[in-house]
Amino acid sequence: YISVHVRAHGREILKEYEISPPQFVALQWVGDKEGITIGELSNRMYLAHSTTTDIVDKLEKLKLVKRYKSESDKRLVLVKMEETGKEIINKVINKRISYIRDITAHLNKKELNLLPEILESILRESEKNIHG
């Protein structure tokens, strides 16, 4: 179960930054837009509005995101990424890439070249099973 090990390692990386996996997912969604409402973030994460608010509160406390009033509609509050949030995302992703490189270092060039094709094939097959 490779995914179990990769996820476990990912959680360990996040602990270094005192961020939970759902908080990191939220941070990534916030980073994908120039501003996102709590409601939109809730929908994207399939979480209750209150749960998403708690996540954003924690991220704001860590100075990774900030709430702003929308310029076009003062009733809307947008969540935007702070520079420290961008830095955390980059550091975490780089550590994940490094981990994948480490665990594939024993593969020869031919195996490494085949790996993406094999993974794509497995993904297509799994999607067939899900979608009938």
Regions found by a protein language model. Give the residues of each.
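Residues within helix-turn-helix
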Residues: 38-39, 50, 57, 77
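Short helix-coil-helix linker/hinge
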Residues: 17-22, 51, 82, 105-108
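Short, flexible helix-adjacent loops and helix caps
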Residues: 11-15, 70, 104, 127, ...
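Charged, amphipathic alpha-helical coiled-coil/dimerization segments
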Residues: 7, 57-114
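Long, low-complexity, charged/polar intrinsically disordered regions in eukaryotic proteins
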Residues: 1-5
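N-terminal helix-turn-helix DNA-binding core of bacterial DNA-binding proteins
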Residues: 8-48
